[in-house]
Amino acid sequence: MVSIAFYGGIPGGISTPITQQSEKSKCEENTMFQPYCYNNDSKNSMAESKEARDQEMNLKEESKEEKRRNDWWKIGMFLLCLAGTTGGILWWYEGLPQQHYIGLVAIGGRLNGSGQSNAIECWGSFPGCRPFENYFSYETNRSMHMDNNTATLLEAYHREITFIYKSSCTDSDHCQEYQCKKVNLSSSDSSNSVRVEDVMNTTEYWGFKWLECNQTENFKTILVPENEMVNINDTDTWIPKGCNETWARVKRCPIDILYGIHPIRLCVQPPFFLVQEKGIANTSRIGNCGPTIFLGVLQDNKGVVRGDYTACNVSRLKIDRKDYTGIYQVPIFYTCTFTNITSCNNESIISVIMYETNQVQYLLCNNNNSNNYNCVVQSFGVIGQAHLELPRPNKRIRNQSFNQYNCSINNKTELETWKLVNTSGITPLPISSEANTGLIRHKRDFGISAIVAAIVAATAIAASATMSYVALTEVNKIMEVQNHTFEVENSTLNGMDLIERQIKILYAMILQTHADVQLLKERQQVEETFNLIGCIERTHVFCHTGHPWNMSWGHLNESTQWDDWVSKMEDLNQEILTILHGARNNLAQSMITFNTPDSIAQFGKDLWSHIGNWIPGLGASIIKYIVMFLLIYLLLTSSPKILRALWKVTSGAGSSGSRYLKKKFYHKHASREDTWDQAQHNIHLAGVTGGSGDKYCKQKYSRNDWNGESEEYNRRPKSWVKSIETFGESYISEKTKGEISQPGAAINEHKNGSGRNNPHQGSLDLEIRSEGGNIYDCCIKAQEGTLAIPCCGFPLWLFWGLVIIVGRIAGYGLRGLAVIIRICIRGLNLIFEIIRKMLDYIGRALNPGTSHVSMPQYV
């Protein structure tokens, strides 16, 4: 009889070999090593052991399958989280006010200085100025060429402001000589009376020294501070300050002009520009307008304050004077308290504009202490090149207000630094611009649109990670799409180049027209000015300087040149239309080819590469480079995990669906397998015992191993095989019959790991094709390219990714802070240790352990 050993190849069996036992052993003993001992107790133990082991194996397979199934989701979600974080940071950055940003502006080739000061006009909301709001200002490190006769803003300021006052105020020659004598003003403590005394050595009263001046022609005597007058040749002849520097004398002006609160700008139009040499590393500022200036701010010293009506109080003083003839103009005294005043050039005397409805006064104030000022009403003023005698109010100002400006406004030095330049070409000039100057320019397109494009590109890349094998099979199609796309880009660039040529021609036409108009305007204004006041500036035409007029604007023959320009514009129009038509055809062909998810994924990669090309040109802002550094750091630290997860996804993509369906198949046919195992068990017993229980137990209790050579088994091999074939005819395939007919060989092949597939693989394949799989179908469809973008769990992963990134950044910051604190503690400990040793050394030196000093003894 042949004995057979089973090594776990039959479902329900275990790996421990089945051996024959002695007759002294009982059937109930060692049932753990004899799973086919046919009794109820051992059968129950066998079933329980099988079920526990199968559950454990199923749990392990489910955990591995779950891990592999989630890996590709993690990759996509990580990329989306990274894109979302980057977009959030850049969104926040784009919302911040930026004072400088890099850009290009075509302002002209060589910038030459120009003496054409009439090109500088008054632009603003003030009557007499042109309405204009498109102010711009740039900074550049380009050196500017200046001619010696270059006009400055100071000259234009004198001309424009003087023209406003000359045309708006009453003309009067008040800059005549006054016969003045020095006087002292003194007052008694008991009264408000002030006496006027003629003395040689004067003292200050109310913070000023005083003059009593007579103008014989007008029968007028004025009591005025010395600060308002200028002495001539150490005589008793004085004139108002500023008369020698001005040429327009006006007396009475409308109140709105004297208010001093009208802001204006001096601006130019192309082809002219204003340049301010800053003197720092050859940097310059170029723009179409100068700084904002104000009409009513006096020229010498302009500390002007704004406060409430309680800032200044009138001191009602009575002037005791000698007999006089005509008009005697007495000063008006104020005591003021200013807390936010700014003095120019660190001078103690300042000018203050104080106004109310229909009245205005200029106060000349002397600083008494930190915040207290003694002020008097001024008599004369200089605004531009207009010298005017300030009006005297009919009454004391009540509920007065004050206007405050910086000391630099209307500063002569600043206005002299702005010079007029002109150009006639178009040359890109690298500059940085201030965003608050009003220029209609935008930041580089790395804002919201680029963020959206980056998120779309990252999503496409995440989806293409699961469709890579599809994309690899259609490389030719992708290359064809790229070729069409490149052709579209080239056509667009060529069209833009032609449009730029058109713009250059159009710009030249505008410059020529503007030059002609500017020449006519210059001549008209010079004629008007010459007819009114004579030659007052370098005009290139009527002045005696003899500087020749630049005839470069008149070199072109208008009729010939304009016809040539028009013909060139028409030719360029035709070329542009042809190129754009070709670009449209290429784009249409590209869209026809561009119809698969893998092409979309490749387009996302190309889009991302184009966006990445913007990174080196983001500008000088350190914040953008910090953002890029953090993104690169995150990619470097996370790339090993991404690659490892991608490898797992690639290797496990084919088995994820089969594992799931295998598990599902097992649960569905578990009862059928149990029935088949029971049948095998019965067949085995029938073959071994031949229907005799005593003979089976006798064989079971023998000492010889059951190694497949039992005589009892060899007597009936055909009946055993026949029983198996009879039972399994309706269930297993022909291939399975052949394998079971030689159980030893099948078991050995299974144990060695080099055998064939599971006998039930055929029915498993049928189940895969016949039954679907809910969420796992999503995986399979995504791998096949029919599901383009994963969309499950995005908000959760996005939030979690943001939390992880912020936590990592905070963790590094806290660790750095801990290192700094540790270093500081070590430094402090070292310092304390050095101090301790020094003190200990000094203490030991001053208090030695043994004294060697002998004290004197007295007998």
From Swiss-Prot:
Cytoplasmic compartment residues: 636-859
Residue ranges the record assigns to the propeptide: 1-6
Keywords: Cleavage on pair of basic residues, Coiled coil, Disulfide bond, Glycoprotein, Host cell membrane, Host membrane, Host-virus interaction, Membrane, Transmembrane, Transmembrane helix, Viral attachment to host cell, Viral envelope protein, Virion, Virus entry into host cell
The keyword Phosphoprotein is annotated on this UniProt entry: no
Glycosylation sites: 40, 112, 141, 148, 184, 201, 214, 233, 244, 282, 313, 340, 346, 368, 399, 406, 411, 422, 483, 490, 550, 557
Coiled-coil intervals, chain numbering: 576-624, 663-699
UniProt entry tagged with the keyword Transmembrane helix: yes
Protein name: Envelope glycoprotein
Organism of provenance: Equine infectious anemia virus (isolate P3.2-2)
